[in-house]
């Protein structure tokens, strides 16, 4: 866990360490520690992760990204979708089923790919995978 604010132009540098987690809930803990150390709440959803990136400007260094890519890959994503389908409301079961089918067909995104997409959707953030 590391957040460095001493870079040029007051840009920040945040480090997400893949060695600190092996599943999505561990990822949420890691990013909560990195980005929200002084807050009363923790990230617990993909939308919540997206929300905490607003206002952050700088670079995110994701160490051991290959480990995270495997940990948050096909199997973890399949279980993630199956749990949402099983839970039902408030989730749109048809949409989640479609996402699961796309994943199984090899055209859907894994959790790792979704997280990368979320980070890259913020133009003020540079992502570095190590």
Q: Which ranges hold each PLM region?
A:
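Positively charged, polar, low-complexity stretches
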Residues: 1-130
């Amino acid at each position: 866990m590391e957040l460095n604010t001493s870079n040029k132009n007051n840009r920040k540098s945040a480090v997400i360490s893949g060695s600190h987690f092996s599943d999505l809930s561990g990822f949420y803990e890691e990013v909560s520690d990195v980005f929200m150390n002084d807050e009363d709440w923790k990230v617990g959803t993909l939308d919540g992760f997206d929300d905490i990136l607003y206002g952050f400007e700088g670079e995110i260094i994701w160490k051991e990204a290959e480990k995270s890519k495997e940990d948050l890959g096909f199997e973890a994503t399949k279980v993630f979708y199956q749990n949402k389908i099983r839970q039902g409301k408030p989730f749109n079961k048809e949409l989640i089923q479609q996402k699961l089918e796309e994943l199984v067909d090899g055209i859907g995104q894994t959790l790792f790919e979704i997280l990368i997409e979320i980070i890259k959707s913020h133009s003020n953030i540079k992502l570095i995978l190590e």
